[in-house]
Amino acid sequence: MKKRELNFAEIKAIKDGYIPAPYVLEEGEQINDFYLEPVYFENEDGPTIGVTTCGVIVKDGLFFKDMDNSGELAPYKDWRLDHETRAKDMVAHLPLNQQAGLVLNTLWNTPLSMTVDEAKDENGNIVPAKIFKRFVEGEPEPKSILPGVSMRVDDSDILVHKLAAGVYRGDMRASAALSAMYHNLGTQYVEYEACQGGVAIPYSMHTNPINIGYPDFLGVGAAVMGDGNFDLIYNMADTDRKMMKAAGQNIMYGPQVDIATDPRWPRNSGTYGEVPEITSGIIKELVRGYQNGEDGLNEGSVVLTVKHFPGDGPAENGFEPHMPIGQWRLYPTEGSMEKYHLPPFQAAFDMKASSIMPDYSRVATDGRSTPQYYRGKLTSTEEVGSTYSKELITDLARDVMGFDGYVNSDSGITTVQIYGVEDLTVPQRYAKAISAGTDVIGGNSDSENIVKAVEEGYLPKEDLDRANYRRLLSLFKVGRVDNPYLDPDYADKVRKENFEGAKKAAYVANQKAVVLVKNHDNVLPMKKGAKIYIECFKGIDPGAALAQSMGAGVAGGDDNEVLRKQIAALFEAKGYTIVEKAEEAEYAYLHVWPCSNGMVFYQYAMPVIEMVDNQLFEAREANKSQKKTGEMVSITTLKDVDKIKTISEAVHANGGKVVATCVVCNPWLLDKLEPYVDGLTFQYTISPVAMGNALGAQVDVLSGDYNPTGKISLTMVSCMDVIEITEKEIDGVMREVCASPNDVPGYDKDQYIDPAILARAKGGSYAYYDADGNYYRAGFGLSYK
């Protein structure tokens, strides 16, 4: 590698001229052999220019990045012009293969080291292949845990397929500096490859929401409902924004603002709950915090990708649309989309959210649904996945609701979630999605299929130009085009400066997220110094390994003893005595963590929200359809659930009290828990990085060191009658229909349920009714004072 020596004293004297690229490859060398330290040129009243293999144009004493090494100051290189002019002109200069690559994101970008030191050789030089995986000819395709989605991610995505973005899956323990270096390498590769025939576009790292210790999403909803304001949301987002930007994580694949309405849906746990007003308030503060203001993108922004438009909550009886078995959204209730599901998206659009992600699913337009309108407009008539629906992502989102960003599909929509477009070829699917209004498509690197779509006439060139323009415009607005490079040391500094404060705020948020729902005879808080017997109960989580690999796993595994010891240590630190026999205890404390069988990527039965141990349920055609196979499958949502009653009887027989915490990731049926306990709290957190905070916070509440303020964010189901599934003939087809509508939140379901069914429910409601006469409906929660 040849590095040109630059005399910056002489450079400053140049009024008009050209500065060649600071680095030049020599014969036999490849760009991925080196980590190049960027060279910077400071404009006194303009942006800094950062380059590695691009030259710099000097005009009127100002520096401009020569993004194609042509020597011409084209409008897209001229930072004095407005963003729109530059983005439009850049599109005009892109070759077709780079335009195609600009549409795509890879899914599994994972740095190969944890620290900068790990990425060095024995001489202290950075080895790119220790950070960014290098393409190896003939290497077999990694086995995919996501059917139809490639797990292969290496530098060929950039150097061959012309992509300029990927989803960062780095371990949270990886240093911020290492993340920044990964970003810099991606940008370096794009810059070099573009200068051989294209345009240097910044490399973008998307990331799913990364928990830095705050409660999981339902817990956030519970906390703000208790607060009565959304202050903690803005502070969380603003702090996270600073750390993300410094580390090169420029785009958030979130937040998820779906409203939870079907009780069996496994992704209820990823929502902020079921109350549209609460989710709307949360998304407003998230946009303000992450995008650094209320007026759209700016140089301090992280791009938000609000999902899953127009709301995935009304799933068909809990089946999830990552797989064909769950491809339908149902709207049996007139006006439900406008009343419940679209308000959070409207709130996001009003705050100028910069991107949306459509859901995988498609609306059922047969007798299972009623036509849905928004502001007088019929929302959808075509039974295709939302990414393919012009009615939804252009006519509704843009024309009616005022969205003005870019549309980023979820991953796999051209290979797996091809609902309604099964008969189209892959190039035709790309064409339909892009022409419908989708600008970015996730999870693929097959840019050649987009090229083919244009060349074979399926995709009008102007539609591809529009998609590229919208994506590039966001890059110009956040100020990443002229100097996309990052300072790894600064990334570590920013994380260090912000992380301690974030940890403290996150712990307080966990305290606020604890919900006290039962306090019979004021059994709580627990008497200081008392003897406590602890037992942990957990279900079998078939999706834990997959979730863990995606960076969204759950803590604790199946080892209840490890969890018991962790909780015991927290009680002991507050002066309590832990005993080994329930009969010796003044209090039995039960930590109850049910696990859903409703996996996203392996669905073999209807999701179960009862607390069951080795109970048989009807099997379905796994992932393919809801058709019953005639076989039965064993499901355990809570091991040894019957032991709860046994422990309760033993403790009560000796004059003791029973207190429990239920981990709520779905609206569990509590008939095998609540009747046997004197005190009951809810907490909503299962992610590993936040589990310690969640456990500490719940012990703070149980001990009386924190007065609980949290409110239920997800109405708990009263009995199986209110969610009973019956078969009915609809439009000549036998369908399974839920007793309560799939599209209405739990707090509002009673008005739509047959009164005869409600009469069979304890308390006469969809909401769970406890022994003390309280309904576990969204918004309910007790305090000590």
How should each PLM-predicted stretch be described?
Residues 188-194, 229, 274-443, 447-452, ...:
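Second-shell residues forming the walls of enzyme active-site clefts
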Residues 170-174, 217-232, 263-282, 319-339, ...:
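Glycine-rich tight-turn/loop motif centered on a GG-T
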Residues 104, 147-149, 168-172, 201-207, ...:
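Hydrophobic faces of well-ordered beta-strands that scaffold small-molecule active sites
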Residues 6-12, 22-25, 34-36, 58, ...:
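Active-site-adjacent structural elements in enzyme catalytic domains
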Residues 1-61, 67, 122-148, 152-155, ...:
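C-terminal non-catalytic regions of proteins with extracellular/luminal or membrane-system context
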Residues 355-358, 402-409, 440-443, 460-466, ...:
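Acidic/polar loop patches that form or flank catalytic/metal-binding clefts of enzymes
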Residues 106-112, 174-178, 209-213, 251-252, ...:
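Solvent-exposed loop/turn segments at secondary-structure junctions
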Residues 88-99, 104-112, 188-193, 241-250, ...:
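Sec-exported extracytoplasmic/periplasmic mature domains
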